[in-house]
Amino acid sequence: MRITVFSDTHTRHNLITNDLPGGDLLLCAGDIMNSGYNKDDIISFCEWFSNVKGYNDKFFIAGNHCRYFENYPEEVKGILKEYPLIDYLQDEEVVLYFDGPNGEHTEDNIHIYGSPWQPEFYSWAFNLPKNGIELAGKWEAIPDNTDILITHGPAFGTLDTVIGRPWDGLGCELLADRIEIVKPKIHVCGHIHSGYGYEFKNGTHFFNASVLDERYEYTQKPMTFDWDKETNEITFL
């Protein structure tokens, strides 16, 4: 399975089009907006995302800059109905089924879960008190059989530091604890732009897929890789 991951385009999604080679899955880990107040930013992203060529399935979540998603969820649902080729996940699971030779569903399916929340971060969207009961509840909702987890923020201690402060992890401790239990094969996040990169530990492939750097310049490319679910091995393109 060929997967491309990206995050934090902040309305500059058109910049990355030529770095999307096509494949099975295209995953976005949030912050498609900038101020978060302009619904035209949502429409612009959805138009673009829908028209990206060469992918079988496309999923995205919101992030802390996506205030409109949190403040006007019903209006956002109405917007998203106009774009049936893409799927938005907010504390939701989707299962990709693969058919056998006679059209029957096989056991070779993939469970994907997406959630936009993070520990309180200034006055942005999808904030919950750090290490609080509500945030713990969001992560407890991640199904135990999740293969691919998409969250906006990173887990504590993994791809979560800012330039000049490598000792000061900004990721979520409760999310890290839940990942240790669920052990998803892939975790995709963004949020901390300078945390961009890849790590593999304890059986999970971690991707911080932020494409804009700290100056909001496009210097960090989407990551595309081939993934074998059975062996959990990946090969970067």
Predicted regions and their residues:
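Binuclear metal-dependent phosphoesterase catalytic core
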Residues: 94-101, 106, 177-182, 186, ...
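Active-site-proximal beta-strand elements of phosphoester/diester hydrolases
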Residues: 1-10, 29, 108-118, 147-152, ...
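Short, electropositive alpha-helical surface patch
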Residues: 76-86, 169-171, 200-213
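Core catalytic region of metal-dependent phosphoesterases/phosphodiesterases
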Residues: 6, 11-102, 181
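Active-site-proximal segments of metal-dependent phosphoesterases and phosphodiesterases across multiple
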Residues: 33, 38-41, 47, 121, ...
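Catalytic metal-binding/acid-base residues of hydrolase active sites
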Residues: 10, 32-33, 64-67, 93, ...
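Binuclear metal-dependent hydrolase catalytic cores centered on His/Asp/Glu-rich metal-binding motifs
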Residues: 107-148, 166-173
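Short hydrophobic/charged patches on amphipathic alpha-helices used for structural packing
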Residues: 15-17, 140, 176
